[in-house]
Amino acid sequence: MRIVLDTNVLLSGLAYPRSLPGRILMQWHHGSIEVVLSNFILDELRRVLPRLSNRHGLTPAEIDDLVDILALQAEVVEPAAVLNDECRDVDDLPILGTLIAALERDQADCLVTGDKDLLELSERYPIMSVAQFCERYGI
């Protein structure tokens, strides 16, 4: 199973290792699933991870190291160009573009996200919520 993980799933999984997103990250760590990301997702994660610094005591250098490790473990693709009217929230276009690029290269089966705007596109694209993914694949 190869999946694109949205930034919100990565952040939740890192913040709460026993949560459903945390269980997905654990499956990735154990090699049960492969993850596809883009530099956009990695950069966004690098921007939002400082929110966890109070909870987990991460320094800026540790955050950089963590994101670099995730980049090494993931398949990194360049997001495909997506028309602005494809998504209600234009900020989600690079995430959708990451999924499309991965699908075009046969590198991913679906996008796992908690973003409601992206989930609304699930009839046109293989997009699942964290709960749907975990239920479907017994995670």
Language model features by range: what are they?
Residues L11, L42-D43, L118, C134:
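Alpha-helix N-cap/helix-start and coil->helix boundary motif
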Residues Q27-V82:
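PIN-domain endoribonuclease scaffold, especially VapC-family toxins
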Residues M1-L37:
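Short, well-structured N-terminal submotif of metal-dependent ribonuclease cores
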Residues L14-A15, L49, S122-Y125:
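Short, flexible helix/strand-to-coil boundary loops that buttress conserved ligand/catalytic motifs
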Residues T7, N39-F40, G114-K116:
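Short secondary-structure boundary segments
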Residues A71-C110:
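Active-site neighborhoods of divalent-metal-dependent phosphate/nucleic-acid chemistry enzymes
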Residues S19, V36, A61, E86-L93:
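Residues at secondary-structure transition points
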Residues R105-V112, K116-I139:
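Acidic, PIN/NYN-like endoribonuclease modules and their adjacent C-terminal/linker elements
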